From Swiss-Prot:
This is Oxysterol-binding protein-related protein 2B. Residues 274-284 have a biased composition (Acidic residues). Transmembrane segments: none annotated. GO terms for molecular function: lipid binding. Residues 285-294, 600-635 have a biased composition (Basic and acidic residues). Expressed in roots, leaves, stems and flowers. The gene is ORP2B. It comes from the Eukaryota. May be involved in the transport of sterols. Residues 1-22, 256-298, 600-639 are annotated as: Disordered.
Length: 693
């Protein structure tokens, strides 16, 4: 195969070079440095540009370098690429070369690029799902790569490298008939005939120009369609990559009643996993996980024929970022209890709704109920453990805080397609306590949560206080408490959260479970790990559990020595295509939705009716900030209201345990719209409201 090194290109500052190089159509390859994460920084990768597709792979071993076939004309960019390739070829014969494995691909026809203004070696490639941060060894190498990108048909430069690459608009086309007129006069034709010929040419050109205009519009539509299809097809196109990265060699994983399963993220590094997730987003509009519909309406709801939304409303205003430092500076010396954080730091759901988000994978409890009915108690306990872990999956990438509910604020969720009804209420303001109750097919779930926070300068540690209870109709009960959550890089760096600690799931019959959420370190290549076991009443391990709280969970019978026979318990749903800065899951996007006919059934205390939260969801940021300040002034009266003898409407305290239990009656009151004893807590505050409460 003819390998040539890219010579020092006669490039201008903005990357121009000779036209022959751009139009040669040769494959381009070389070593680029790719930014991975803060722990590992810049890592060298082997990049190959061919047929409009940019692929990259690790280069630890010679077999990781793709040289295509001997007939391909490959142009290498950079001295380091040539030197390293020759050195690797001398160390390993061609016969040892194995099948090439990419760890990332980029379809350039639906991508764009931009060179860095601050560093002459850096440039960026933008796709619908990610941004590649790349760096070369020199200015000339960057110019060569940018020329190669520009020569790829259809790529759109964000900062034009050379004006010749843009598509010529039909209105800029023109035609000159001077040569034609001159030639006709030379043939002896008279002026009237020449003028007639000129008119014919102009007429034909106008028709051609109109056709070009139509083709131009069609081209734009096709490019838009390609960009939309890209997100839907990336996972299918990269399925081979997915298997290569995540499949444990020679392991065959089987899921519970779902056939063979060949993916296991526990073997992949955080870098590999991130690279794959960036290029393979799943285009799935379904928000629920129950694969089988219930045969009868066990929870008292009839399935309504409507489609829940798959995206948030388009913002009505352009959001303006907020500097945390400037906000701290502006509030130095002020009473912090009266400082109102702007809605920029909030996501458009409340903590009440976030409680319901933990039930996104409620089908696990349905499965647990069925397993228990058929005498498979171990599988019931395993599914309960998977459910306890699954509630953390939605926290990945969520950088905004939910709204703090007002005292007495409520939230209902009637999801007949999932077979569940959920209700929650803020039952105390000092301390803040949220109680919830949920009914499913053959099970009930309830609990209350109070967060104790500790500020450590660069991080905030949240320790949940409260017990969650799951009771099946046959009397089997499981109880557990949530683990500690720590939010890192509050002031500087990339904000992220981690969950860590021991979760003990206690059963009142044969099995209990213990899970350890491993705390993530700065250089951890395999974060979010969960490991544990299920034991019987004698203390003997019945099954071993392992996986990641943001991705999947597996189990192996016994002590877990033979992980090759592991079975899938739970797999997180892929991120939706219509992501916003809130990083909502498809399920989370439905939580604050006012479906047709729902508003007139809700009590005036429901979170969906909270004005600042609704304005934020609609992108009306100024109104949202105004309403948030108004409601927080009202919130400061909550202690006085609570101390005056206020009691929650739908929950009652259980003795000295400081826990709350649902008293019943909400759904019955909803059926007859009996909300006379529910004050309008979101309205204008008056002393009468306090007396009423």
């Amino acid at each position: 195969m003819p390998l040539t090194r890219s010579k020092s290109l006669p490039a201008t500052e903005n990357g121009g070079s000779d036209r022959e190089t751009l139009q040669s159509g040769r494959s381009v390859a070389g070593i680029l440095y790719k930014w991975t994460n803060y722990g590992k920084g810049w890592r060298s990768r082997w990049f190959l540009l061919r047929d409009g597709i940019l692929s990259y792979s690790k280069i630890r071993r010679p077999e990781n370098v793709n040289l295509l076939s001997p007939s391909d004309d490959l142009r290498l960019i950079g001295d380091i690429s040539t030197d390293r390739l020759l050195r690797m070829k001398s160390c390993s014969g061609r016969s040892r070369r194995k099948h090439h494995k990419n760890i990332g691909i980029v379809h350039l026809k639906v991508s764009s690029y931009r060179e860095s203004k601050s560093d002459h070696r850096k440039f960026y490639i933008f796709t619908a799902t990610k941004t590649l941060h790349l760096r070369t060894d020199s200015r000339s190498d960057r110019a060569a790569w940018l020329q190669a990108l520009a020569s790829t048909r259809g790529i759109v430069p964000l900062q034009s490298i050379n004006g010749d690459f843009s598509f010529v608009s039909p209105k800029d086309l023109s035609i000159s008939t001077e040569r034609l007129k001159k030639r006709l006069f030379e043939e002896g034709m008279n002026e009237s005939l020449v003028k007639e010929c000129e008119q014919i040419v102009d007429s034909e050109f106008c028709e051609v120009q109109e056709q070009i205009k139509l083709l131009h519009e069609e081209r734009k539509k096709l490019l838009d369609a390609l960009r939309q299809l890209e997100m839907a097809n990336l996972e299918a196109e990269a399925s081979g990559i997915h298997d290569d990265v995540y499949q444990l060699r020679n392991h065959k994983y089987s899921s519970l009643g779902r056939g063979k399963y060949s993916e296991c993220s526990t073997s992949a590094s955080s870098d590999d996993k991130q690279e794959f997730e960036d290029i393979s987003e799943e285009d799935e509009a379904s928000f629920h996980d129950t694969k089988e519909s219930f045969g009868e309406p066990d929870v008292g709801s009839v399935l309504t024929h409507f489609k829940r939304r798959t995206k948030l409303p388009d913002p009505a205003e352009k959001e303006r970022g907020v500097s945390l430092w400037s906000m701290i500076k502006d509030n130095v010396g002020k009473d912090l209890t009266r400082v109102c954080l702007p809605v920029y730091f909030n996501e458009p759901i409340s903590s009440l709704q976030k409680c319901f988000e933990d039930l996104e994978y409620s089908y696990l409890l349905d499965q647990a109920y069925e397993y228990g009915k058929s005498g498979k108690s171990l599988l019931r306990a395993l599914n309960v453990a998977a459910f306890a872990v699954s509630g953390y999956a939605s926290t990945e990438g969520r950088h905004c805080k939910p709204f703090n509910p007002l005292l007495g604020e409520t939230y209902e969720a009637d999801f007949p397609e999932k077979g569940i009804r959920f209700f929650s209420e803020k039952v105390s303001h000092h301390p803040t306590v949220i109680a919830c109750h949920c009914e499913g097919k053959g099970w009930k779930f309830w609990g209350d949560t109070n967060l104790r926070s500790k500020f450590w300068g660069r991080s905030i540690q949240l320790e949940p206080v409260g017990i969650l209870t799951l009771e099946f109709d046959d009397g089997e009960i499981f109880q557990w408490s949530k683990v500690t959550t720590t939010i890192y890089n509050i002031l500087l760096g990339k904000l992220y959260c981690d969950h860590h600690g021991i979760m003990k799931i206690r059963g009142n019959r044969q099995y209990s479970c213990m899970l350890k959420f491993k705390e993530q370190s700065i250089l951890d290549r395999n974060p979010h790990q969960v490991n544990g076991f299920v034991e019987d009443v004698t203390g003997k391990k019945a099954a071993t559990v392992f996986g990641k709280w943001n991705d999947s969970l597996y189990y192996v019978a016994g002590d877990g020595i033979n992980k090759a026979s592991a079975s899938l318990l739970w797999k997180a749903t892929k991120a939706p295509p219509n992501v916003t800065r809130y990083n909502f899951t498809s399920f989370a996007m439905t939580l604050n939705e006012l479906i047709p006919g729902l508003e007139e059934k809700l009590p005036p205390t429901d979170s969906r009716l909270r004005p600042d939260q609704r304005h934020l969801e609609n992108g009306e940021y100024e109104k949202a900030n105004e309403e948030k300040q108004r409601l927080e002034r009202r919130q400061r009266m909550s202690r006085q209201i609570q101390e005056s003898g206020w009691r929650p409407r739908w929950f009652e305290p259980q003795g000295e345990s400081e826990s709350y239990k649902y008293t019943g009656g909400y759904w019955e009151a909803r059926d007859v719209k009996s909300w006379d004893d529910c004050p309008n807590i979101f309205g204008e505050f008056t002393e009468e409201v306090a007396d009423c409460a």
